[in-house]
């Protein structure tokens, strides 16, 4: 029987069906779990959760109060039985989400990235232990990421790129989720398709939890045998998602086929061209972009613009051209965080792409003079603005100019949250 109880009544051995809290504020990945020890109760307390639903058929019931000699009997604790599902509030249509500046979104995006990392780590840990995941509870996280991307795609996508090598497996999933959402919007997909594509991005690499950690995190080149083990992750993930709750066809498809290539040289099935779905083609582009822009145990990431150049060179055999071109439009020719050289001789970092304006004319924060070879007071330039004569002449490598920590020029106050 389901029963709603107060925090003070929670005890070891109870089976919690659901905490009375939003999924984002819950300290647990799984909605339902057994209270195994005092540490579990302490986590609930620290999260500030005051009520929970328990299932007395799967765990112990509340303690009945000891009845002392008293003039009046003690009333039994009232039981509340769930008879109807809770009403779900429909999310705001993405077309109605108000777009904001990079500065306005960075703080919110940083919090979402932090929460996402914890949630994905918990979800993937459950998968590594062989437990079935409840993927439908990831949808509120997808909604948070989607809302941020709709407000300003550069903020969360840029922040997710700044993962460490140790965080890669988990933050890669968050980044691909955000990239899939931005690409879905660019392709004109419906809100529901955008959500499903985002969920697919979040779950696409769940199968890597079946790969031994020493192979997954190996700093050197993989042996042929080790690479064969890694190549099994799409199939392993597909099997995991078949057992999960709330996973639709799109997530299953992307999980299994995001390493397929349009020329048939991909894996696991060697599909080509139209044998590969739109969503799997999207997953392939987003997966590769985040992989090559991220620091890995065995290599440093490339800058965003350099990564797009490399992908363009590979695109004929690897990617669907229509999808790849839409991807470029979704993040810009010079994505946020790209170091560029201006016609004036100044170096700057791209801080924002502007909706409805030329991809060649983003906002840039100039901070270094190549003429005097010295740092200059940072100045924000809207290259699309009236009277602005400066323009981008090249993308640059920070190491060429011995520049350190250029990300601070676009992160601003959010740098402390990364």
Model regions and ranges:
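Histidine- and acidic-residue-rich, metal-dependent catalytic cores
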Residues: 103-418
